[in-house]
Structures are given as structure tokens and as C-alpha cells.
Amino acid sequence: MRFWLILTVVCPLVLTAENPVIGNHRAAYDSKGMLLPWTSWKDALAREMNWYLQCPVENGYPRFVYMTFMQGDYQPVASRRDFIPSMEDGMGIISYLKYYAWSERKNPRILGFARSMGDYLVKESLTPDTGKFPRFTRSTGRRAQFPQPPDCGTQADKPYEIEPDKGGIAGYALLSRYEETQDQRYLDQALQNGRVLAANMVPGDEEHSPWPFRVDYRTGESRGPVSANMSFNLRLFDKLIEHGHTEFNEPRAKLWDWIKKNQIPNLAKNGSLWVQFFEDHQEPDNRNAWSPLNLARYLIERKEKLDPEWKQDAHALIEFAVRNFTSIRYGVPVCGEQTYDKEPWGGVLSTYGAVLAMYSAATGDGEYKALANQALNFVLYAVNDDGCPRENAVRPGRGGWQEDAHTDKIHNFVDAMTAFPEWAN
């Protein structure tokens, strides 16, 4: 693979001088120039989780549950009131549930914080009970709102817009939360999101996904014909079907048919069906790495139950990310987010590392194993000694965008440590 050629050139150069500072720590390399972790993964993650478990609770929620931009002293970033509830808290629920299980279910406070994220989604972040997308979880909002007002859209969303795919993320996370606690509220909201998605689904083709990227929840007026992230809507439908809700069989079949026949083949073309995911962007040609990597993750998890060609398709999805979004930082191949922002933010880089690790473990193919380990080592250099992380390891600091710093990161390390348990130590 071409990255190995790059590594043989870059890493020896790194070793000829004093090792650089990556994020918050002096980098450590082995004799072959491969980046080592600054502490064990298990220790770094424990420090980070402990730091978040000390987060002040106000209005019934830890602060990071209702704000996206939080500093290293748990205070809000004054200049940033925008907030991404479905993505931040949805992926946070998944992270906390996975870490709770991986850490042998020893600390009930972890489960309690997952409950706080679920409660915020079902109590504070819904659209009004009217219009085309009623009682649907919001993609964006404003920090410290209880509940979010009807016109709370921020970042690149207009005031009354939602992003359908983010409802898939929130719905899937809430259903996972329901499975842990049997709290009916979470199942009810997952069902509501699923039913609203099914009611607003349209036929996809070579230029349109089954849902647009943005929609005015009142009128259904759409903006952006393609939404790249279809894997979580598929996950939500699949999980609702598992719980006996067969009404989702037909929309699920139509969605998978479009993914398999249109979206995956588009990887080898211009990538036009892989544009639009991040809440703060609206460029129509903005391809991203997060969506194909998360579809690859689902194929790897389900294998032949979902896709008889899962190995081939997962490889193509990974290669799309490698081809379009990777670069070298401090001798380490890293993955960026999107066409218009190729910084190795913590969420996408940990996603990249986890999916490559999962593919390596599932197939026995070593093509990506070292790349996965290096990427994830890089991510953890953002974690300070006291456990407070920065949003990426490009420079020193504390806090920032919480989805990148924490909530869309922890579950990726759990997946990688499940694939290769020895990496935890």
C-alpha cells in the first residue's frame, strides 16, 4: 500500500531530531519510526472518562450534554452558542454504552451520563408536534436551551431546518439506550424518528439520496439533494424490525437497494453521492470520510447478513476515504473530515482508525492494521494528563468541539480494542 512507502521516508526524518510535540505530549516512536502511545489506551481512556464524570451538572444535565463548545475548565466557549444535539449526544450514548460494557459494567455513573444524553434528546431537542417532521430530533440548536425553541437551527442550518440523517443517528442511539434500560421513552422516540423518516422517504437515484440533506420541518422544503450518511437510517430501520416493527421492512429494503445499487458504485465515479454530512457546511460538492467509513463499519459488523459482498464493498469504502482525505502529520498517516476541511479531527480520525482495525480483524488481512494503530495513537495525544481532551492532536490545548474531543471518539476506541484486545495495554 502506498502509505508504507511514505512511512519509510517520513518517519526516519522524524527520528533525526528531537521528537516533536503532538497535541499535549512529546511524541514517542519505536526503532522503526512508528508512533507509540504516550500512555496505554486503557489509561488514557480512563483518565478522559473520569474527567467527564466530574463535569458540573446544571439544569439536570452535565454541561457537555447541552453545549458543543466547552473549554478545559468545563465553561462554555463564549463566542460559540451553536450546538449539535443529535450527533453529539447520539454518538455520546453509543460511546458511553460501549465503554460501560467494555469496562465490565463497573461504574454506574457512566450509564447515568448516557441516560442524561438520552433524556436531553427526548425532552429538550425535538421539533414541535406539527409539520412534515413532527417531534423529530434536531440536528442543530443553541447551547443551554431547555427545551430548544422552534427556530433553533444554527451552524449551516436555517432556523427551521433539520437534517434527516441526524434523526437516524439519534433514533438508533435511543433504541440502543432502550435495550440497556427498557425505558419506554427511548423506544417511543426511536419509533417516532423512524416513522417520520419512512413517511418522508423518496425514491433515490444517481443524483438524489432517499432523503435530502436539509429540510424545513414545517413545510418539507428541501435543501441539498444528497445526504451521504445513510448507514444510521439503515441501522435504525434494522433495529426497529428486530423489535417487531415490521412496518419498516419496505422502507428498509428500498434504502438498502439504493445504497447497494447506487451509492456504493458511486465510490468509483465522482463521489457525488458522498457529499454533505457535517452540520457546519453546505457546499454542494463537499464529499466526506465519515459517511463511507461508518457504512463500512456496518458492513463489517453484519457481514453476509447484510451484504454478501461485504469485504469488497467495505474495502472500497475505506479506500475512498484513504484516497480523498488522508495526509501525513508528524510521520503518521491521518484522515481528515471532508473536502473543505481535511484536518484530522478526533471524531473522524478515531472513526478511521476503528474501521480499519475492525476490517483487519474481520478479514485477517494486515493491509490496514498498522495504519489503524498509528491513527488511534495519534488521536490520544490530544488527551491531557488530567484526562481533558482537545478536539484534535494537531496542537496543544484543552476542550473545544465536544463531538470531536469526546463523544464520537470513545466508541471507536472500544471497537478497536475489541478487534485487537492487546492494543488496550
Regions found by a protein language model. Name each.
Residues 18-88, 109-154, 185, 192, ...:
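Low-complexity, Ser/Thr/Pro/Gly-enriched N-terminal "stalk/linker" regions
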Residues 164, 168, 175-179, 183-266:
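Solenoidal tandem-repeat scaffolds enriched in leucines and small polar residues
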Residues 102-106, 124, 180, 200, ...:
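Alpha-solenoid helical repeat scaffolds
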Residues 19-30, 34-41, 71-90, 99, ...:
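Solvent-exposed loop and edge beta-strand segments that line ligand/cofactor-binding
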Residues 95, 117, 170-180, 193, ...:
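Core register positions within helices of long alpha-helical scaffolds
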Residues 249-252, 310-314:
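Alpha-helical repeat scaffolds
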Residues 10, 58, 327, 331, ...:
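CBM-like carbohydrate-recognition segments
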Residues 4-14:
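Bacterial N-terminal signal peptides
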